[in-house]
């Protein structure tokens, strides 16, 4: 029985699913010698492109006289799926006390995105000189690993036995508080149990909290347990205390049915009473860790993001030959369709190993019979609608425009259902190998709203997300209904979506913003949607692929 005045300590806000901390381990092979007598003293400097400039993030240690170094110092960086995060790795010779690359110390560099590294787990690239030529046979290998444990939860169940009685006319009303010791040796309250009334042998309710909250993900961090007799005046009577660590708690309950117990000690009684043993015992009956998988767990476990594009070719876009058309192909300024394709697709392509993307159009009359189609391949190859990289999608879009007649209506359900078919097949495998993301670029209100709602509700049960970017100045109020932010979307028959899989964004909100802002907004929800889907299906990530460089360890610096 719990007392309403004894509230549980609230959990701190959960870490944003889109953000994870990644450690990069770096090694090089075959670095150039700057002179014939000595080998280089290499160091790797990591830079991140942020706010239109390259900024140093981390650097490795310096290794002496080594042309194939394996650095021990990891390069840590925050990872965001929705951002491009371009990286540069500069290798330089620090033999003469150099602290940065120069024309005399530069050994080579390479550039890639953080998304490319985490999606492949291990990347090996040639080092390039400042003139763009390869630095001999020099290579750099980068291995990514997510900082683990930050999302895990632990479930604990405690009871006590023969606690001291602190009440004159009844039994104690015990509750327990758990504290973790901070780096400055101060104690921080992390949990308070409910009060069990009039009971010297209380069994407290099981509770669940994050490993980060309990011990800051440090299993050796000291934990302090204090047991009190509740008093409505707020002056609770101290019964006793004990200390432990999460490691000790795990080891003490490792086997089925195994429990761990501690004497509950009141230091004042211990120091004053010769025959004092304890003020009761506290028993840990259950200690289980619940692994909460992250987006990076799935990506590093081999899950590919399958990206599909659908482009609105209805007449409301305007004649492409007119400068006022939303499909105008001006040599001076890319139209909004092209801008959205480049920014959103440019990020998604880093997570697809073959870099081939199906691209469809809807709402146009297409050759040879010029009948209206709502899911035609923009490369006009219905057997193989895939384009090579996002640049191939853009090239197909440019070639497609002069060959079709913009028409209507704006029917979106057919393309959603088309992408749902392979997602349905993927679901049947029961594995986390491919998650589909459909990008719909449209200029107006959906004509087949009822069918679209039905298609989205069906897709919400599949490994699939839908991003809708509204292009132009139309009234998109109906489109926001699909987003599900104001409550679960329902199909016309009243069946609710299993989860929120649609993100709608009007392009005009980002017209004057940096190109990356649009991608940041529309892709921010994808990591959460991926994790939610696989968690709802009870599907764990695949085993991380082997990532340790098979290289001889470098000599100590």
UniProtKB/Swiss-Prot annotation:
Cofactor(s), names only, from the UniProt record: Ca(2+)
Positions of Ca(2+) 2 binding: 167, 229, 231, 237
Transmembrane segments: none
Keyword Cell wall biogenesis/degradation: no
Effect of residue 96 to N: Does not inhibit calcium-dependent translocation to the cell membrane
Protein's GO biological process: cell differentiation; cellular response to calcium ion; positive regulation of dendrite extension; postsynaptic actin cytoskeleton organization
Domain VWFA: 306-526
Self-association state and partner proteins as the record states: Interacts (via second C2 domain) with OS9 (via C-terminus); this interaction occurs in a calcium-dependent manner in vitro. May interact with NECAB1.
Function per UniProt: Calcium-dependent phospholipid-binding protein that plays a role in calcium-mediated intracellular processes. Binds phospholipid membranes in a calcium-dependent manner. Plays a role in dendrite formation by melanocytes.
Record protein name field: Copine-6
Organism, scientific name: Mus musculus
């Amino acid at each position: 029985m719990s007392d309403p005045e004894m509230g549980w300590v609230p959990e701190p806000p959960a870490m944003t699913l889109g953000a994870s901390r990644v450690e990069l381990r770096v090694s090089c092979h075959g670095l150039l010698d700057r002179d014939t007598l000595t080998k280089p003293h290499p160091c790797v400097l990591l830079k991140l492109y942020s706010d239109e400039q390259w900024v140093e993030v981390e650097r490795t240690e310096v290794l002496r006289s080594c042309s194939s170094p394996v650095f021990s110092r990891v390069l840590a960086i925050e990872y965001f799926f929705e951002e491009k995060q371009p990286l540069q790795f500069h290798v330089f010779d620090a033999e003469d006390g150099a602290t940065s690359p120069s024309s005399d110390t530069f050994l080579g560099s390479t550039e890639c995105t953080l998304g490319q590294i985490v999606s492949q787990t291990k990347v090996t690239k040639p080092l390039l000189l400042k003139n763009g030529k390869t630095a001999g046979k020099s290579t750099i290998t980068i291995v990514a690993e997510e900082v683990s444990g930050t999302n895990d939860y632990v479930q604990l169940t405690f009871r006590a036995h023969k606690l001291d009685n602190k009440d004159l006319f009844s039994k104690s009303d015990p509750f327990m508080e758990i504290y973790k010791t901070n780096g400055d040796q101060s104690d921080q309250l992390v949990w308070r149990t409910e009060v069990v009334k009039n009971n010297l042998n209380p069994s407290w309710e099981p509770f669940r909290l994050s490993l980060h909250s309990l011990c800051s993900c440090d299993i050796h961090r000291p934990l302090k347990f204090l047991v009190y007799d509740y008093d409505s005046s707020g002056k609770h009577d101290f019964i006793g205390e004990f200390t432990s660590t999460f490691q000790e708690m795990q080891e003490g309950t490792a086997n089925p049915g195994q429990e761990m117990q501690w004497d509950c000690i009141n230091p004042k009684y211990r120091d004053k009473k010769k025959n004092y043993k304890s003020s009761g015992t506290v028993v840990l009956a259950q200690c289980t860790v619940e692994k909460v998988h992250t987006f990076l767990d799935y990506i590093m476990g081999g899950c590919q993001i399958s990206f599909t594009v659908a482009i609105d070719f209805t007449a409301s876009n305007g004649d492409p030959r007119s400068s006022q058309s939303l499909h105008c192909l001006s040599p001076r300024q890319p139209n909004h369709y092209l801008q959205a394709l480049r920014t959103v697709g440019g990020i998604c392509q880093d997570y697809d190993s073959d870099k081939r993307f199906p691209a469809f159009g809807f709402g146009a009359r297409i050759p040879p019979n010029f009948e209206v189609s709502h899911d035609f391949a923009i490369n006009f190859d219905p057997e193989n609608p895939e384009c090579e990289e996002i640049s191939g999608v853009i090239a197909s879009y440019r070639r497609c425009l002069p060959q079709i007649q913009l028409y209507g209506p704006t029917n979106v359900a057919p393309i959603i259902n088309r992408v749902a078919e392979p997602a349905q097949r993927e679901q049947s495998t029961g594995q986390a190998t491919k998650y589909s993301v459909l990008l719909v670029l449209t200029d107006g209100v959906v004509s087949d709203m009822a069918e679209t709602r039905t298609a989205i509700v069906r897709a919400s049960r599949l490994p699939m997300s839908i991003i809708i970017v509204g292009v132009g100045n139309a009234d998109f109020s109906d489109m926001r209904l699909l987003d599900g932010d104001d409550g679960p979307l329902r199909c016309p028959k009243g069946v609710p979506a299993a989860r929120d899989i649609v993100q709608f964004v009007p392009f005009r909100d980002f017209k004057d913003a940096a190109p990356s802002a649009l991608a940041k907004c529309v892709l921010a929800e994808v990591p959460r949607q991926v994790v939610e889907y696989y968690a709802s299906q009870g599907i764990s990530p695949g085993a991380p692929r082997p990532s340790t460089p098979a290289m001889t360890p470098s000599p100590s610096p």
